[in-house]
A protein has these predicted regions:
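Non-catalytic cap/lid and distal C-terminal segments of serine-dependent acyl enzymes
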Residues: 18-26, 31-56, 60, 65-355
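Single conserved hydrophobic/aromatic residue that forms the stacking wall/gate
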Residues: 1-9, 13
Length: 355
């Protein structure tokens, strides 16, 4: 427990009636009834903290204290479908929910809720052949530290010992780490389902830590300068350490036509900074809600002039994907996509409805 927060009191759960039309959050630990997700996509939170003076749920507001020592809160409006982080804040102290499984986000271990999307199951576990996610450790001379990447191999990998596979290097968002695409993003289930349906080639997917540490600008240093250093080492680590490590330890196709990179949010920026500066290494590029600094006004010189020869770029980059959710203020990404197309640079724009 933390300042009186407890996940116990299962006897209380047995006596109470749960709000109609709600089910336990899928990320609750076994036996935990709260948080609960309503059919209206609102979330019902309940926390046992009898000695607390104030309890809040991050991003959602203050809870109401009940007579039995529990505090409760219901989302003010329906939540957007998908995964969302939250913390319990008890008298000013933030903590993960003891009723939930931990997820690394916001630069620390926190809790998560899942708002299911009706009629959609591409990210659900199904009765199809399942791939394996393994840990692979290597020493980084650049960072002077041991590092870990998570590696997805398709279900057929061990059954075809002579077959080599294309590789996708997949990066997380700001404040997350190498576990995030597997834990929060369910990438293994997505890949399993796509491969089983014949919508994706069997491939290896590598997830590494983008060095997105929490940072503060040093005395006399501007926030912009500090931000410019944020994750700046990662492209070199990927090119000179991660890719050689993967190609030495897994059966990979090592030419650029069989190598892709994509990333979420800040991972999208790392993707652009890596791939657009190393076009000899990658033929597929993806930004998912991706941050970016592609300068449309100076398109011929940005990223060392990679876009200047339009035909060469379009011939060499087989897919340049820009995706974002309709609830994420997609205007900037749409403007980037339209600007690139107007300049003669092929790209695929996708706006995910309701996310």
């Amino acid at each position: 427990s933390t300042q009186g927060v407890s996940s116990a009191a299962s006897d209380v759960y047995k006596r109470q009636e749960f709000p109609a039309g709600t089910v336990p959050n899928e990320h609750n630990i076994n036996g935990a009834e709260y948080p609960r997700i309503g059919e209206d996509r609102r979330v019902h939170f309940r926390v046992f903290a009898p000695n607390a003076k104030k309890v809040e749920i991050s991003f959602r507001g203050e809870m109401t204290k009940e007579a039995d020592g529990y505090w409760s809160l219901v989302s003010e409006k329906p939540e957007v479908v998908g995964f969302h982080y939250y913390q319990i804040i008890v008298d000013g102290v933030s903590t993960a929910d003891p009723n939930g499984k931990p997820f690394f986000g916001m630069g620390k271990w926190v809790s998560g809720i899942e708002i299911p999307e009706k009629g959609v199951d591409y990210y659900s576990i199904k009765n199809v052949p399942h791939g394996l996610i393994s840990q692979s450790w290597y020493y980084s001379d650049i960072r002077k530290e041991w590092r870990r990447c998570l590696v997805y191999t398709p279900a057929e990998y061990d059954k075809n010992p002579s077959k080599k596979y294309p590789v996708l290097y997949l990066q997380h968002g700001m404040g997350e780490n190498e576990t995030s695409w597997a834990n929060q993003g369910k990438m293994n289930f997505i890949m399993d389902n796509l491969i089983a349906e014949g919508k994706a080639k069997p491939m290896i997917v590598v997830m590494d830590n983008g060095n997105i540490e929490v940072f503060k600008n040093k005395p006399g240093e501007s926030l912009a300068d500090a931000r410019a250093k944020f994750g700046a080492q990662f492209p070199a680590i990927l090119i000179h350490e991660i890719i050689p490590h993967i190609e030495s330890n897994f059966r990979t196709l090592t030419d650029r036509d069989n190598r892709a990179m994509a990333g979420l949010s800040w991972g999208g920026l790392l993707t652009f900074n890596t791939t657009l500066n190393n076009p000899d290494k990658f033929a597929y590029i993806g930004g998912f809600s991706g941050a970016g600094n592609i300068d449309l006004k100076n398109i011929d010189t940005t990223y060392n002039g990679i876009f200047k020869d339009r035909k060469a770029f379009n011939d060499n980059i087989h897919v340049f994907f820009l995706g974002i959710g309709s609830e994420e203020h997609p205007e900037r990404t749409k403007k980037l996509s339209d600007g690139l197309k107007a300049a003669g640079i092929n790209n695929i724009y996708y706006e995910s409805p309701g996310t």
